[in-house]
Amino acid sequence: HDRPKFCYLPADPGECMA
């Protein structure tokens, strides 16, 4: 996980962008 991105399913908190 480097840059934040939109949440995908299944998504990790570190991969979610508000």
From Swiss-Prot:
Gene Ontology CC: extracellular region
Tissue expression: Expressed by the venom gland.
Subcellular localization: Secreted
Secreted is among the record's keywords: yes
The entry's keywords: Disulfide bond, Protease inhibitor, Secreted, Serine protease inhibitor
Statement: the UniProt record of this protein carries the keyword ATP-binding: no
GO terms assigned for molecular function: serine-type endopeptidase inhibitor activity
Domain BPTI/Kunitz inhibitor: 7-18
Site, as annotated: Reactive bond for chymotrypsin: 17-18
Family statement drawn from the similarity comment of this UniProt entry: Belongs to the venom Kunitz-type family.
Function: Serine protease inhibitor that inhibits chymotrypsin.
Protein name: Kunitz-type serine protease inhibitor C9
Naturally occurring in which organism (per UniProt): Daboia siamensis (Eastern Russel's viper)
